[in-house]
Amino acid sequence: MKSGDVIRKLEKAGWKLDRVSGSHHTFKHPAVAAIVTVPHPRKDLGKGLVRQIEPISGVNLREG
């Protein structure tokens, strides 16, 4: 899965870009006490990273 796709799905679910540090974009959600960091730009994120982001964000990233 491309990092751009992950970022689009997070933003659609209400996550806002908080900061950028190098090639890592960090997102915050006003209703969730957590942050999500996505390396960007990357063509393919590992399956393990996508699986880790899903429960934190509450967003199903692997669904079409």
Enumerate the predicted regions with their spans:
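C-terminal structural segments of small proteins and small subunits
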Residues: 12-13, 30-64
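Polyanion-binding surface elements
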Residues: 1-14
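Short linear Ser/Thr-Pro motifs
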Residues: 3, 21-23, 57
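Major-groove DNA-recognition helix of helix-turn-helix-type DNA-binding domains
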Residues: 13-29
